[in-house]
């Protein structure tokens, strides 16, 4: 039972739970970024460059069997090696956007941390005997 108890203590620690929440949110956030890239950004980029679908951009590195449709999926099913650079472009744009969003978030968090001023601790109260000595000194000066 010692191992089970140790594991429970380990799993309930704040860092492990924070990590689990981060992974779950990161997975969901990754899906949002994928959707933004594939549904919003890549169609605009494709429109600008004259191609609407980057996923079908590829270079065939072998011979294509007769009767095989000239699509990436069909050529891959036929076992022909291909260089699928269109998919790479989509994934690279996805990565750049995700990295930029994370950069902006970290920058904002750091800014908020800097803006929160740390108040210096209040000086300790002057002991009563010192206070009395100061009052005596001040009265003698007059």
UniProtKB/Swiss-Prot annotation:
Keywords: Cell inner membrane, Cell membrane, Ion channel, Ion transport, Membrane, Transmembrane, Transmembrane helix, Transport
Transmembrane regions listed in the UniProt entry: 10-30, 40-60, 86-106
Pfam annotation, one family: MscL
Membrane topology category: Multi-pass membrane protein
Locations listed in the record: Cell inner membrane
Family annotation (PROSITE patterns): MSCL (PS01327)
An example Gene Ontology molecular-function term: mechanosensitive monoatomic ion channel activity
GO cellular component terms given for this protein: plasma membrane
Main location, first listed in the record: membrane
Family of the protein in this entry: Belongs to the MscL family.
Subunit and partners: Homopentamer.
HAMAP family: MscL (MF_00115)
Chain's role: Channel that opens in response to stretch forces in the membrane lipid bilayer. May participate in the regulation of osmotic pressure changes within the cell.
Protein name: Large-conductance mechanosensitive channel
């Amino acid at each position: 039972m010692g191992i089970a108890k140790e594991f429970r203590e380990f799993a309930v620690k704040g860092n492990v739970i924070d990590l689990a929440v981060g992974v779950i949110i990161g997975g969901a956030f990754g899906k949002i970024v994928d959707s933004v890239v594939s549904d919003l950004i890549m169609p605009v980029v494709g429109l600008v460059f004259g191609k609407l679908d980057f996923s079908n951009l590829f270079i065939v590195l072998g011979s294509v069997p007769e009767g095989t449709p000239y699509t990436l999926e069909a050529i891959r099913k036929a076992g022909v090696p291909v260089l699928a650079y269109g998919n790479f472009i989509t994934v690279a744009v996805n990565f750049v956007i995700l990295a930029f969003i994370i950069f902006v978030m970290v920058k904002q968090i750091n800014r908020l941390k800097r803006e929160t001023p740390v108040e210096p601790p209040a000086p300790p109260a002057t002991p009563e005997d010192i206070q009395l000595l100061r009052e005596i000194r001040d009265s003698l000066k007059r």
